[in-house]
Amino acid sequence: MIQIGKIFAGRYRIVKQIGRGGMADVYLAKDLILDGEEVAVKVLRTNYQTDPIAVARFQREARAMADLDHPHIVRITDIGEEDGQQYLAMEYVAGLDLKRYIKEHYPLSNEEAVRIMGQILLAMRLAHTRGIVHRDLKPQNILLTPDGTAKVTDFGIAVAFAETSLTQTNSMLGSVHYLSPEQARGSKATVQSDIYAMGIIFYEMLTGHIPYDGDSAVTIALQHFQKPLPSVIAENPSVPQALENVIIKATAKKLTNRYRSVSEMYVDLSSSLSYNRRNESKLIFDETSKADTKTLPKVSQSTLTSIPKVQAQTEHKSIKNPSQAVTEETYQPQAPKKHRFKMRYLILLASLVLVAASLIWILSRTPATIAIPDVAGQTVAEAKATLKKANFEIGEEKTEASEKVEEGRIIRTDPGAGTGRKEGTKINLVVSSGKQSFQISNYVGRKSSDVIAELKEKKVPDNLIKIEEEESNESEAGTVLKQSLPEGTTYDLSKATQIVLTVAKKATTIQLGNYIGRNSTEVISELKQKKVPENLIKIEEEESSESEPGTIMKQSPGAGTTYDVSKPTQIVLTVAKKVTSVAMPSYIGSSLEFTKNNLIQIVGIKEANIEVVEVTTAPAGSAEGMVVEQSPRAGEKVDLNKTRVKISIYKPKTTSATP
């Protein structure tokens, strides 16, 4: 634990502890380099700092997060190591997590839930295009800023933690409520697993609770692939069917029925509150699968020892064929109740055995495997003896420099310690060749010539120092903008690892961002700051009932385009504006009351612009009081503010009797 008030990593003054996860602590700190800007510093716990697998995965996942630059993803600002402690710094979000927000405001309105889920989907779209699957999406990992902006956090870190200690089932309890059916069955998490979790989160926003709960992780996991999703509308009647259908499709148990991508889900979500989908039917999938009824695999004797004692004893007492427990020969007329009780008891025992076997099948996907022993720190001879004793074969020996592990001792195994493998599998040993490394410094902001000279002094070969130029309006030419290896990385001189320095040069081009969904005023200001001439920014308005006025609907050129500010290339932004004209519906045959209500409440025609007249002639079969004529006709465009609508109601002539 870091002392409050301490300056950590020579840069961060620790203010207070604000979080404590399964394997890391989170502190609020002030970045002294950035004039005291508040950041959140996440530090890997001391007991995991000596675990090379945990450290390597922490660093790898942190770098992956650093590449995700998106307004709805918590931004990583720094990664490093201080006194043997792995850490990462990220933007501090001064707000609530979505779990707490739901608890205080449930159920969320349809509009707010759609807005928040839309932001989450945009964040995950970027992650998925970068090949990153979150695997642990839940409301606790979604932060809300004071203005209601959603930001996704903890990309992959939770997964790296869980893989280091597979026996810590408590770490699963926090996210099993959002676990996809395929993950519950033991399959690898995919993009569609993230989509399932977002569907469960969406359900929770609109109802105030999770759909599946129970006393244990096993009970909850079983429900994910056995129990149908409870109806959202039954609990929250204000939810339209089109919106519930988004949740139904996102949480489909079969992958073939589920959204294939977050983009597909985002498009469907965007129109879920549209008037055009008001009469949509409920989605119903056939979720039955042969996999649900297949024969249970044979359970080994070693696996049976893991069943709780009560279950194991019950299995020994069960009979071979319960259906033959009572026959004509064994029937005793003097005590029928006793035998009926015995029969029920035997059936109950058989059921318990079946349930136990089912749980073993679910929780032990590879019942014949055993965990690889942890031989880190042992000599090669000791490690070989330990592995052979566990019935593993010895594979290749590889050497690797290490700052912490003594020469000739084991750094790690491949596959890693704790990983399940079958007996007889060859296990490779990674042996320390001693110290042959140095710590990478922070080169950003320094002159590239000085950095190159420093690296050469540390014996880094010329051919491993690569310079890449990048245009910049903000930094002086020749200044290092980025470095491929973060500050604090241990650089091994025995490996041909390239160091890439991105150096500033005078800018003439910019990368266009994704402006769709953003406010046009903000985007125009941003483009001007990037030296795009105002006369080259063209705004085209387009009516929309789905997008908020002033929001960008389309852009040209598209996101990611390299734009040369020195050339007169026009940027066109299509901006949403309020709908002022619609196609006239047909009211022929409708009642006057229905027609007026529909025109005023649904179409948006002002009551003062509606004229009702009575006519005495009408087509045969017309009922009195029904609309027989309308102007404008059905399908014609009407201006909601100017067009006058004329409705003709059939009123037959009354004939008086002749005296």
UniProtKB/Swiss-Prot annotation:
ATP binds at residues 18-26, 42. Residues 366-433, 434-505, 506-577, 578-651 form the PASTA domain. Residues 1-342 are cytoplasmic. Its EC number is 2.7.11.1. The chain crosses the membrane at residues 343-363. Residues 541-561 are annotated as: Disordered. Disruption phenotype: Disruption of this gene results in a strong reduction of bacterial growth, and increased antibiotic sensitivity to penicillin, cephalosporins (e.g. ceftazidime), and vancomycin in vitro. Cells lacking this gene are highly attenuated in virulence, and demonstrate an elongated shape and very few division septa separating the daughter cells. The lack of StkP does not disturb FtsZ ring formation and does not affect the expression level and the phosphorylation status of FtsZ. Residues 364-659 are extracellular. It is found in: Cell membrane. One of its GO terms (cellular component) is plasma membrane. Was identified as an important pneumococcal antigen that provides significant cross-protection in models of pneumococcal sepsis and pneumonia. Was selected as one of the lead candidates for development of a new pneumococcus protein-based vaccine. Is a component of a trivalent recombinant protein-based vaccine candidate for protection against S.pneumoniae, whose initial formulation development evaluations are described in PubMed:22538529. Its main location: membrane. Pfam families: PASTA, Pkinase. It is a single-pass membrane protein. The active site is at residue 136. InterPro entries: Kinase-like_dom_sf, PASTA_dom, Prot_kinase_dom, Protein_kinase_ATP_BS, Ser/Thr_kinase_AS. Homodimer. StkP forms dimers through its transmembrane and extracellular domains. Dimer formation likely promotes autophosphorylation activity and might be necessary for targeting StkP substrate. Interacts with FtsZ in vitro via its kinase domain. Consists of an N-terminal kinase domain, a transmembrane domain, and a C-terminal domain containing four repeats of the PASTA signature sequence (Penicillin-binding protein and Ser/Thr protein kinase associated domain). The PASTA domain binds to peptidoglycan (PGN) subunits, is essential for StkP activation and substrate phosphorylation, and is responsible for cellular targeting to midcell. Protein kinase involved in signal transduction pathways that regulate various cellular processes. Likely senses intracellular peptidoglycan subunits present in the cell division septa of actively growing cells; thus, intracellular unlinked peptidoglycan may serve as the signal molecules that trigger StkP phosphorylation activity on a set of substrates. Plays a crucial role in the regulation of cell shape and cell division of S.pneumoniae through control of at least DivIVA activity. StkP also plays an important role for bacterial survival in vivo. This is Serine/threonine-protein kinase StkP. It comes from Streptococcus pneumoniae serotype 4 (strain ATCC BAA-334 / TIGR4).
